[in-house]
């Protein structure tokens, strides 16, 4: 039975680090984590004990105190680790049923959404001790061996690069697009590299798109070009040198809540949000939940034909949570199962559904408060109303008080999102 005792630095709710004494014991049937002599965490089967070799520092680590998960915790999730034979592994951080190799009837794991499994724990972010300590517990089917010709310095970037590549694929650049990466530093440079890789694939089929890095530090301009940007432009903190709609799509990698308004102004068609900073922005309080669930905000369609394009389900009649006081249009009930009521009550209804994901496929909102409620119906609970990678359709409102929602309803902007 593996049994290790070690000291590690916990990150605390006071935004400081404090030493703690840990013990991990268990085997393939399950592990117990002890902290300062007290039982801290009980884990079922599907984990393996690894020794941390290196760990990157992510903006999520820097914003950890804003996230809705308990502290203290040993943080760090960009991990390179060793097994008992000294073999190197990188780790996909979401400990879902799928990642733990468990035969389970979880509808999320069965639907190709294991990174959104509600029962998952997340390495270095939610419960599981992370790579800033000497030992960690990783899901058995999420440990990827590192080839011998890949150095440690590159291997430790695999997890954040996977997140960057996921963003590039979620964005789905179109031929001829002019894309901007706003605020590239750690993650943003990897997003540029991922876009360059996607563009290389597209060029083989005769398609192309442009990538511009928007930086505040001139020293980052050359680095951005090295990572694959066609051009790098030095801008002020609001990119005031650039006109509205200067780019087809803007990827916000800043980790700064104030930058979203800049991205909204610069984007003609779409903003892709890649920041989980845990703070309010553009009048919305639940943007981190939106990114965690990889949701999309889009304009409510004017007719039935536009509605079909908004659906993310194969169901002929998707479940739709209608939150505005005004009645839905007459054409909608024929195309969706329209649920009306308070958001927390609707969330309870869809959770009891015997078929498909226990979530609404879409929601309709007419205010920032309704968008927040669609993301997290109960602010003290992480249970969402809308399914992962679902869509919240925004109706026009004269009192939205949100530049983001105004842009969605007045010029058909979309906000998409992704995480690791």
Predicted regions and their residues:
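A short acidic, Gly/Pro-enriched loop at the edge of an enzyme's catalytic core
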Residues: 241-250, 353-363
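Mid-domain Rossmann-like dinucleotide-binding core that forms the NAD(H)/NADP(H) cofactor-binding site
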Residues: 150-237, 311-351
């Amino acid at each position: 039975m593996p049994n290790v005792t070690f000291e590690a630095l916990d990150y605390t709710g006071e935004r400081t680090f404090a030493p703690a004494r840990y013990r991990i014991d268990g085997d393939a049937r399950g592990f117990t984590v002890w902290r300062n002599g007290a039982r801290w965490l009980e884990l079922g089967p599907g984990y393996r004990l690894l020794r941390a070799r290196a760990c990157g520092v992510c903006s999520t680590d820097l914003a950890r105190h804003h996230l809705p998960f308990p502290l203290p915790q040993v943080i760090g999730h960009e991990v390179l680790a060793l097994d008992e034979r000294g073999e190197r592994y990188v780790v996909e951080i979401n400990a879902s049923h799928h990642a733990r190799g468990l035969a389970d009837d979880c509808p999320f794991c069965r639907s190709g959404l294991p990174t959104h499994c509600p029962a998952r724990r997340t390495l270095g972010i939610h419960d599981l001790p992370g790579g800033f300590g000497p030992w960690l517990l990783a899901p058995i089917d999420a440990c990827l061996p590192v080839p011998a010709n890949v150095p440690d310095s590159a291997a430790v970037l695999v997890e954040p690069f996977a997140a960057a590549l996921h963003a590039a694929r979620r964005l789905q650049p179109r031929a001829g697009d002019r894309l901007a990466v706003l605020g590239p530093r750690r993650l943003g440079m990897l997003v540029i590299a991922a876009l360059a890789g996607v563009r290389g694939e597209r060029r083989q089929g005769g398609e192309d798109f442009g990538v511009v890095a928007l930086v505040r530090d001139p020293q980052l301009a050359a680095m951005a070009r090295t990572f694959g940007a066609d051009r790098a432009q030095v801008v002020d903190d609001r990119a005031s040198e650039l006109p509205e709609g200067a780019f087809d799509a803007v990827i916000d990698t800043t980790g700064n809540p104030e930058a979203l308004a800049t991205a909204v102004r610069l984007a003609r068609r779409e903003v892709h949000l890649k920041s989980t900073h845990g703070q309010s922005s553009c009048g919305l309080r639940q943007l981190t939940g939106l990114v965690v669930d990889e949701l999309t905000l889009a304009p409510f369609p004017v007719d039935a034909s536009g509605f079909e394009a908004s659906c993310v389900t194969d169901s002929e009649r998707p479940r739709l949570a209608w939150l505005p006081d005004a009645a839905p249009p007459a054409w909608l009930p024929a195309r969706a199962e329209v649920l009306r009521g308070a958001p927390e009550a609707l969330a309870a209804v869809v959770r009891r559904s015997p078929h498909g994901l226990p979530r609404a496929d879409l929601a309709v909102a007419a205010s920032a408060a309704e968008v927040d409620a669609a993301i997290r119906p109960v602010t003290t609970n992480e249970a969402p109303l809308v399914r992962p990678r679902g869509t919240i359709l925004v109706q026009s409102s004269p009192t939205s008080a949100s530049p983001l929602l105004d842009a969605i309803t007045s010029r058909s902007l979309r906000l998409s999102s992704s995480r690791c």
